[in-house]
């Protein structure tokens, strides 16, 4: 394999991965906006779990398909009209990851700083306290700049599919991207 062909293949793979990642980030923002709309409509126990994929997002909820699609379209319109705050959620799993990371790193740092004088349980407690203080604001920043992207101006909600499992539905909401960004 020639070096030029190999480098071109690496570039194409990187370009493809970048597009997939960008689509997931945009769908993550729309998923958050959908949950935000559901909560604003008083469906507090409605949106339970959501996650984004390159072609849309999945929500587990007690709301029916029409309610989810309506909330998704409303949430998308909110972001498109400039309300980027709905794309950041206090309930996002990113916040849990950030809290765990801060707790672990701060516990290690405290142990290193205090050395043999330290008590492991106190280090863990201090790590937990630091995590509690900083995880929400840092989690919001990580969502804003890493795990979501609110540049969704040309995206459309394509369709929805639902499966009922007991008292819950599993909803798949499909998004469409113009200009081959999802190919």
Pin down the residues of each PLM region.
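Cytosol/matrix-facing juxtamembrane amphipathic
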Residues: 27-30, 34-37, 41-60, 134-183
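Short hydrophobic alpha-helical membrane-entry/anchor segments
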Residues: 108-118, 135-144
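Transmembrane alpha-helical segments and their cytosolic interface motifs
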Residues: 83-110
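Short, charged cytosolic
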Residues: 51-79
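Small-residue-enriched core segments of transmembrane alpha-helices in multipass membrane transport
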Residues: 119-134
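Short Lys/Arg-enriched alpha/beta "domain-start" segment
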Residues: 6-24
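Cytosolic juxtamembrane amphipathic/interface segments immediately preceding
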Residues: 16, 20, 82-87
């Amino acid at each position: 394999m020639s070096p030029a062909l190999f480098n071109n293949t690496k570039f194409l793979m990187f370009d493809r991965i970048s597009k997939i990642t960008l689509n997931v980030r945009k769908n993550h923002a729309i998923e958050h906006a959908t949950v935000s709309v559901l909560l604003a409509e008083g469906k507090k126990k409605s949106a339970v779990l959501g996650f984004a994929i390159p072609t849309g997002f999945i929500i587990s909820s007690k709301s029916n398909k029409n309610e989810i699609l309506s909330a998704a379209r409303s949430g998308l319109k909110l972001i498109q009209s400039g309300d980027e705050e709905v794309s950041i959620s206090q309930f996002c799993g990113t916040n849990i990851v950030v809290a765990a990371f801060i707790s672990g790193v701060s516990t290690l740092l405290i142990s290193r700083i205090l050395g043999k004088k330290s008590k492991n349980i106190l280090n863990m407690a201090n790590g937990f306290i630091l995590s509690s203080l900083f995880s929400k604001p840092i989690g919001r920043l990580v969502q804003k700049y890493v795990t979501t992207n609110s540049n969704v101006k040309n995206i459309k909600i394509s369709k929805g599919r639902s499966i009922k499992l007991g008292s819950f539905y599993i909803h798949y909401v499909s998004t469409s991207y113009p200009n081959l960004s999802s190919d």
